[in-house]
């Protein structure tokens, strides 16, 4: 497995690779959201059923526009999400019909976050798009908190580890339904 900086890993992602990278609270697994084969590989590595869907993380809301159906949201709903970003808040928003079901699962919505973590932001900026994001762990197990554990648990399963530090969040992000305002998971 390659160990790279956030700026060096862009070609790996562009070629369909799956990476591990530090986020605000835990290590994440990620790939290109427009590459179904990469998403399938990520789901296989994590042993996660496609039906559950995945999160997109971005450096700006503009990067999420190809995926989110903003026409189904009010200005107040959008303003509320923007008031929490960048930061540890994930919003479940209506998804555009062309978005792969491998990414959105069985839902007519998709979970999205604009990250404040500098490495996540660098990754998304270098790709010029969001990154698929899910916690780096096998389904049902605790998330990975160290690069050493990534190297042990995922050595022959992923293509690269992005070097860097986790953020200061003790818990994963809060998840909010953008349409109803309902908190689906309390985070930090």
From Swiss-Prot:
It is found in: Cytoplasm. Its EC number is 2.7.7.87. One of its GO terms (biological process) is tRNA threonylcarbamoyladenosine modification. Its main location: cytoplasm. GO terms for molecular function: ATP binding; double-stranded RNA binding; L-threonylcarbamoyladenylate synthase; tRNA binding. Residues 3-188 form the YrdC-like domain. The keyword tRNA-binding does not apply. Keywords: ATP-binding, Cytoplasm, Nucleotide-binding, Nucleotidyltransferase, Transferase, tRNA processing. It catalyses: L-threonine + hydrogencarbonate + ATP = L-threonylcarbamoyladenylate + diphosphate + H2O. GO terms for cellular component: cytoplasm. It comes from the Bacteria. The keyword Transferase applies. It is an enzyme of class 2 (transferase). Required for the formation of a threonylcarbamoyl group on adenosine at position 37 (t(6)A37) in tRNAs that read codons beginning with adenine. Catalyzes the conversion of L-threonine, HCO(3)(-)/CO(2) and ATP to give threonylcarbamoyl-AMP (TC-AMP) as the acyladenylate intermediate, with the release of diphosphate. NCBIfam families: L-threonylcarbamoyladenylate synthase (TIGR00057). Belongs to the SUA5 family. TsaC subfamily. This is Threonylcarbamoyl-AMP synthase. It comes from Shewanella denitrificans (strain OS217 / ATCC BAA-1090 / DSM 15013). The gene is tsaC.
